[in-house]
């Protein structure tokens, strides 16, 4: 049973499909190098140009564990990898601004916070 599983065609198909998804895109006029890409996506990612050694292949071959070894924080890592995937798919590359909490806090505690605020307003009158 184990022998049959090791040599089944599904394992070969899975390996082939993963390699085809990991294609390297050629630099364009808009984004000629890694520095331009990291500057274009924003969120102070251009600080990591030295980490990538300004090599285009490093941008597409390095994954999360490698970037973690290089000392890139998790939020930046996820953002960069997300933008690299968008570049692979041919989507437009632009900065995605960080979200901002509302005055009343996050969505889980918003109702509670609004109720307390309204109670304080009533008591102040």
Swiss-Prot record:
Coiled coil: none annotated. Keywords: Mitochondrion, Ribonucleoprotein, Ribosomal protein, Transit peptide. InterPro entries: Ribosomal_mS41, SAM_Ribosomal_mS41. It comes from the Eukaryota. It is found in: Mitochondrion. Involved in telomere length regulation. This is Small ribosomal subunit protein mS41. The gene is FYV4.
